[in-house]
Amino acid sequence: VIPMFEKETGIQVVYEEYETNEIMYPKVQSGAIAYDVVCPSDYMIQRMIENDLLAKINFDNIPNIKYIGDTYLEQSRQFDPDNLYSVPYCWGTVGILYNKTMVDEPIDSWSVLWDEKYKDNILMQDSVRDAFAVALKYIGASLNSTDLNELEEAKQLLIDQKPLVQAYVIDQVRDKMIGNEAAIGVIYSGEAIYTQAENPNLEYVIPKEGSNLWIDSWVIPKNAQHKENAEKFINFLCRPDIAKMNFDYITYSTPNTGARKLIEDPAIRNSKIAFPEPEDLVN
């Protein structure tokens, strides 16, 4: 969609990817490169707001915000209390993807990640945030816990788990699960949709103990050199047809109500992985 934006506006886009929020943060913090638009995750946006790294968005320049569902704007208040600094782009859950031909029974709990019979068949996310989220939820704590005893217990669980883990991965979990190289993997819901299309033996579940519902959003760094152009870009991405094209490409759930209506395949439009029921998100 970037060439479309460039053609429509005459604005040239320099596009750069990063693998984790933790890689992105020091780049923005240092100010070495004056990024105009960045797409961090919820917890990192909160950190950036607290450290005065973000500019308030002029929503007069983003009329397409009307297509972003109220549910997601309300969810965003957990990290952007007054909805001043961010515009939701995509969202999802973290759960377990398992191969039905390689496990003994349906999975419904994080406890399977500590089951010794699956030694060397478990894939974990190479992310401090997601690894701790799994362990904290497993012990019944909040994934945002700051309790030192809970954090220490979660840390010890992850240390104890390490001998059972085949690999700590990010994008590779998708290919390994499709290729039957592991029985169980911690995965983002958007990746799960793609993997199931490639391998029908794969099943995705949000464990009963609860999970992480995350939102990635567009923000504008305080030192942005082209703030109005950044707002034009965000508004463009909020257009339903553009948001739908992005959903088709990345398969992560869209908060754009107009885009969801444009999804042709009812199996995807009504997918419980892409768009879980509210009761499935209680925890």
Show where each model-derived region lies:
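Ligand-binding "clamshell"
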Residues: 49-56, 80-84, 194-206, 268-270
